[in-house]
């Protein structure tokens, strides 16, 4: 979810959907914007993440905070599950807070909960409330997408650990640029820009590769509308070429996972040979996680650079609503996941909303590959190995991908043309009723005379 500042410095590093904080590729900064949510008062909520470099003692304190928050979360989940199975009333958050935090600190078994900020423990209960709310909303249909699973117990072996500090925790930023966290200390931060406003919360994240991030939530005014552009573009997403534009431009797929496959296999083999539970296995697991993180970072960098360039150059953008999950059940699964279409489309969507561009997503059942972009005649489905085809109605020779991109734009109502597209109009054959001698003299059209349609 990074975008190189060497390409588009004024737009910054933005991403809407990812929740996993990743480090940058070597040539980039460490800033990410993970989400933006418009509010009713006109403010926009942004999330900025920066890399943290805690000391050895601070890593121990953070591990203690992760463990305490995990314990409170699991205890609350267990109480609610037991109450549900026994047919008892639903335990409220206030009751759980009193029982699992306030009273538990006074017992010898849970006295160590007092070693961390109480705000961290309170936020663990709120996280459980959010998980249950999302679960019930997915069952009732209020939440879009597939039904999500019921909240599960957290494990100390989970690859991703988080704790959140709100304003009540009285965390702050020091004059030296460090992040001061209660009962943890001043943690060094690698800053890449100044925050646009005072953050309301900060979440400390430890990922599978052992890296630490500070994720700040700020509220600010919507981004400035970019200068109006004249171009409009339709995009057809693919595998050999990641994106094909309606103007004929083809952008090859970098295939980051395929390129890193040899190193990933080597690290996976080394991991499989380590004894379970040993320190060497832990080290090998971290190496595998770091290799995967580099692939994710490179892919995210590519998505950000391309999406920002498209937003800057075009006033309106149209894409097809692809079913990535359906394609992932085919032999193309690895390539589909390597492309990361959904993340790229989400970047286009939120950047268009933020910078005053028009974004249109057409239905996935639109026959973009079956309709001739020159005459509009539907020619029927074609196998994937057919990359060029000739329209039987007008004789135009069409590039499959560019033709689909033009149809995507037209289905979205955009006025685009296939500039530089491989379209070779041919003579239209005369119909049966036109093949004989006309009994009456009349003006002959270009199509009737076999003249190429332009």
PLM regions: where:
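Nucleic-acid substrate recognition interfaces
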Residues: 2-454
């Amino acid at each position: 979810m990074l975008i190189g500042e060497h390409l588009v410095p004024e737009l910054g590093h933005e991403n809407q959907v990812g929740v996993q904080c990743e480090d940058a590729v070597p040539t980039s900064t460490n800033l990410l914007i993970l989400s933006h949510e418009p509010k009713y008062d006109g403010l926009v909520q942004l999330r900025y993440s920066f890399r943290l470099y805690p000391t050895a003692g601070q890593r121990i304190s953070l591990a203690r905070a992760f463990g305490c928050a995990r314990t409170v979360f699991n205890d609350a989940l267990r109480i609610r599950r037991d109450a549900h199975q026994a047919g008892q009333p639903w335990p409220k958050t206030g009751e759980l807070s009193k029982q699992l935090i306030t009273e538990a600190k006074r017992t010898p078994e849970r006295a160590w909960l007092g070693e961390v900020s109480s705000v961290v423990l309170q936020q663990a209960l709120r996280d459980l409330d959010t998980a249950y709310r999302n679960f019930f909303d997915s069952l009732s249909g209020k939440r879009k997408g597939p039904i999500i699973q019921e909240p599960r117990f957290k494990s100390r072996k989970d690859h991703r650990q988080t704790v959140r500090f709100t304003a009540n925790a009285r965390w702050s930023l020091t004059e030296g640029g460090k992040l001061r966290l209660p009962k943890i200390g001043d943690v060094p931060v690698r800053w890449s820009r100044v925050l646009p406003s005072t953050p309301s919360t900060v979440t400390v994240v430890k990922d599978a590769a052992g890296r630490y991030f500070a994720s700040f939530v700020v509220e600010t005014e919507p981004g400035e509308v970019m200068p109006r552009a004249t171009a409009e573009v339709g995009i057809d997403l693919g595998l050999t070429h990641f994106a094909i534009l309606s103007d004929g431009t083809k952008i090859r797929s970098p295939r980051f996972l395929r390129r890193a496959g040899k190193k990933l296999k080597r690290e996976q083999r080394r991991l499989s040979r380590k004894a379970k539970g040993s320190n060497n296995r832990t080290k090998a697991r971290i190496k595998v996680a770091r290799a995967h993180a580099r692939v994710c970072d490179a892919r995210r960098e590519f998505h950000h650079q391309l999406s920002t360039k498209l937003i800057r150059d075009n006033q309106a953008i149209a894409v097809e609503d692809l079913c990535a999950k359906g394609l992932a059940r085919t032999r193309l699964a690895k390539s589909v996941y390597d492309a990361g279409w959904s993340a790229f489309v989400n970047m286009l969507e939120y950047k268009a909303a933020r910078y005053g561009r028009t974004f249109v997503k057409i239905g996935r059942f639109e026959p973009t590959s079956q309709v001739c972009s020159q005459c509009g005649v539907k020619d029927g489905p074609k196998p994937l190995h057919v990359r060029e085809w000739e329209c039987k109605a007008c004789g135009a020779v069409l590039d499959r991908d560019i033709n689909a991109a033009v149809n995507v734009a037209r289905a979205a109502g955009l006025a685009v043309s296939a500039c530089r597209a491989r379209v070779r109009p041919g003579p239209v054959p005369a119909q049966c009723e036109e093949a004989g001698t006309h009994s009456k003299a009349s003006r002959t059209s270009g199509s009737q005379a076999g003249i190429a349609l332009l």
